[in-house]
Amino acid sequence: MFNFLRLSNTPQLTALGGVNISQQSDDIGLAFNNPALLTPRMHSQMNAVFNDFYGGIKVFHLSLGYRNEKLNTNFLWGLNYFNYGSITETDAAGNVFGKFRPTDWVMQVSASRSYLEKWNYGAAIKWISSNYGQFRSNGIATDIGVLFSDTTRLFSASFLVKNLGVQLKRYNNAEQEELPFDLQAGITKRLEKAPFSFSLTAQRLQQFDIL
């Protein structure tokens, strides 16, 4: 359930394959995906994305960054909103009861700090909601990330605990469902004399039986 949490929220992440936690950039949209990527350079940054798909499906994303010098902490507020258009509501016999507009959204607050010169760590708290007509659900989750960055060697590595949480309200009193929990690890190496970098990201590390 809540599988929309797996989707990319920003064009740069989509261009990187949809899953990347170690690519450092000034794009605050990447920090929405991994709080350890949130840096002081993102103070006062805003990332706004709108996608219009077939069938009336629309996706909105907004991220805002803020740096508090007194707390020595970086903050991010972000929202991902999915509108699936207008759908006709019927019963099993085909009787029409009207229309409804299903939506999914997640709102989160992230914070990060640096440790020594090469480490950065961060966490995010997420409020998740789904509305499919009479079927509604919500939940709460957290992301926890750590980033190691060696600017001299142009190398970075990160580990991320993603979507660790619980469903608070079930769909129409259905059974309790699990969130799309994920353990991810990634490395990025930038070439010294060329404008390229290579990334390797492993996901779903908690699933030992992958066959």
Residue ranges and their predicted role:
Residues 1-17, 21, 43, 58-211:
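Outer-membrane beta-barrel porins/channels
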Residues 20-62:
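Active-site-flanking structural segment that lines cofactor/substrate pockets
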